[in-house]
């Protein structure tokens, strides 16, 4: 999915940005769900917390679905997710190939950082 800023079509720009924001929020919800499952399995959540968390995540997903339908951006959100999936798969493949390359050693800075920087 591309957002063409030089297109001067405000509706397309708004739709594209909305799809991007919804995609990011959906990915965050997926991460939250994974963390919730991890905490449930570890026993660190009470039954009431599990119920409340499940209800909140369900409500958030329903609102995201409604927003996608109202804005007619389902296909754009799916396209963003597919594009991100391809980027991640390519990055993982490249990292795996680099790790299996004989003589390859990641460069480290003087402070022990691998050069990735900090955010």
Curated annotation (Swiss-Prot):
GO terms for biological process: gas vesicle organization. GO terms for cellular component: gas vesicle. Pfam families: GvpK (PF05121). Induction: In PHH4 (a deletion of the p-vac locus) transcribed in all growth phases, maximal expression in mid-stationary phase. An unstable 6kb transcript able to cover gvpD-gvpE-gvpF-gvpG-gvpH-gvpI-gvpJ-gvpK-gvpL-gvpM is detected, as well as smaller transcripts. Gas vesicles appear earlier when grown in static culture, possibly due to O(2)-limitation. Its main location: other. Keywords: Gas vesicle, Plasmid. It is found in: Gas vesicle. Residues 92-119 are annotated as: Disordered. InterPro entries: GvpK. It comes from the Archaea. GvpF to GvpM interact with each other in vitro, and may form multi-subunit complex(es). Belongs to the gas vesicle GvpK family. Proteins GvpF to GvpM might be involved in nucleating gas vesicle formation. Gas vesicles are hollow, gas filled proteinaceous nanostructures found in several microbial planktonic microorganisms. They allow positioning of halobacteria at the optimal depth for growth in the poorly aerated, shallow brine pools of their habitat. Expression of 2 c-vac DNA fragments containing 2 divergently transcribed regions (gvpE-gvpF-gvpG-gvpH-gvpI-gvpJ-gvpK-gvpL-gvpM and gvpA-gvpC-gvpN-gvpO) allows H.volcanii to produce gas vesicles. Encoded in a 14-gene locus called c-vac which produces cylindrical gas vesicles only in the stationary growth phase. This is Gas vesicle protein K2. It comes from Halobacterium salinarum (strain ATCC 700922 / JCM 11081 / NRC-1). The lineage of its organism: Archaea, Methanobacteriati, Methanobacteriota, Stenosarchaea group, Halobacteria. The gene is gvpK2.
